[in-house]
Amino acid sequence: MKAYSITDIGRRRTMNQDYVYASEQPVGNLKNLLIVADGMGGHNAGDLASRYTVELMVEYITNEKDETRPVSLLSSAIHHANELVMEKARSAKEYEGMGTTIVAATVTDGCLYVANVGDSRLYLIDQGIEQITRDHSIVEEMIRMGEIQRKDAKSHPDRNVITRAVGVHVPVRVDFFDVKLEKGDKLLLCSDGLTNMVEDEDILQLVKKSASLKEAAERLVTEANKNGGKDNISVVLAEYE
């Protein structure tokens, strides 16, 4: 698998509270590891929450020698990070309310394993585009209840309100997904700074028209900024070989 990651402050924010991680090489007992985190909290708390969570996860997975099951490793790493982020949030007033989304993925033996908390997403891109994760957000719950249409979600006043985050509750509730991959399939992990600014179909076309993962990722960021760039924009793009 090959991967490329990029994060951009966008056009409206004064700080980038997103954090990305992409390793094509083994991390502990995982053959590879991809993560996007979108932090929240005042001052620099969101910036710290996303970076700290990813660093804690990578450290945990690197040092865990006994567990080899991908889902268990991702789950344990997120729960471990959740407890330490909560401790950090209690340690100083400026860290109160800190938290982060997480979408993390690994591929082994042709199978994709995904964990998510919050509204950062993973898409599978082949001839089409499919959102694998499900947002933990107010608007997603409203869509499920039939209260609003999906097309209205992006303009809803509560579109940025998430219902789950790392660093807020113990235990954190994590959703897991697994998908069988075909050679050439692409994976897109991203923060809502991309998906609130660029439609899924436009994401698909930009990726398909690009000659490399780097070009595709950079074009996605450019498009999000062109459409307003209202939030930080993070993209991890990978291809299964």
Question: Where are these predicted regions, by residue range?
Answer:
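PP2C/PPM-type serine/threonine phosphatase catalytic domain
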Residues: 1-241
